[in-house]
Amino acid sequence: MMSLTELAAALRRPLVVGVTSFVLVSAFAVSELSDVDWEPSHFAAFGEEAREIRAYAEERLGSVVLRPQLGHDGRFFFVQANDPWVLEPEENALILDHPLYRTQRMFYPVVAGGLGFFGPDEIVWAMLVVNLVAMGVGAWAVARIATAMWASPWWGLAFLLNLGFISELDVGGAGIVAGAAAFGAVAMILNGRSWEGVALLTVAALTREVMLIVAVGAGFHLWRRGERREATATAVMPLAAVLSWAIYLRTRIDLEIGSAQVQGIGVPFVGLFEAFESWINNPLDLIVGLAVLLMLALFVRRAVLHDNLIGWAFLGFVPLTVVLTEEVWHSYFDITRAVAPLLTAFVLLVALGDDSPGKVSSESSLSEGA
């Protein structure tokens, strides 16, 4: 029988935090599924008014759960997962609203599509399972980082309880996988396993190209510490992977590159000012929007003041918010998804005090168990 001392030691292990997070988020998913007659298409977020993708899904799955209006991101990833290598774009990718933009985010649909071997019925379940596992992995990674800051690994719950990631789960988005890979990369770099970190940053960037911010930020921090080879690989290899996939896509999809393919990016500050007008009529959006702005200011101050890996890795999300459009800023649902990695990084950077992970050696407490 386990003694109290052994139990306490076990509860301090990041792996326990990850498993606990997986169990909790799975319980949430089970609760949601029970309300929709165990229909996994609920998490694919097909929309009533997205007629072409709705017909595509119903042809392959039969009756599906429909969300109001156009639905959300999961509907695009379902299409992509049915042809993750873009081998038949005329039947799949070209029904997406912005094919080049959507198919650039390839890693999540590749995994959910079983590398191209899963059928539609397996895919719609796999999309959910991948996100549930990623939520546990993300919590584990944040717990590992927290232990490097001489804090309780239970701060890993900052990943699980992140409103942006919870929303991503609900709509079948790729943000959880991207976030888990990014925080996993930071944990690996802190543990002196830079090449594993580079691999995870590549995964993150191929899941959501905005995660190149983390790669460049982490590389910049390593460069300033004199780790030039690791810094170069950290910044360059994820970018090379993203560019390589982009080139491949342009051999598969016969569309010209244009600004219409880029979503959510506009003239600096315009989106924020336009969103503020709509916030006046919605107190919840106003409160969340102002809280995000305050968090951005505090994050910049803390990152510059304490000069650590967490700060530099995620600092680039701050200037990104300046160019987000009104469509992203106007609702708490969308803005928290856009800055979800920054929300968790903010907890690590601000709430845990001055013991910064960027100043912990590779022989830190990260090496002490899972």
Enumerate the predicted regions with their spans.
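Short hydrophobic/aromatic helix or loop-helix immediately within or flanking a transmembrane segment
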Residues: 71-90, 94-120, 341
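Membrane-embedded glycan-lipid processing machinery
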Residues: 100, 104, 115, 122-133, ...
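Transmembrane alpha-helices of multi-pass, membrane-embedded glycan-processing enzymes
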Residues: 100-104, 108, 112-116, 127-141, ...
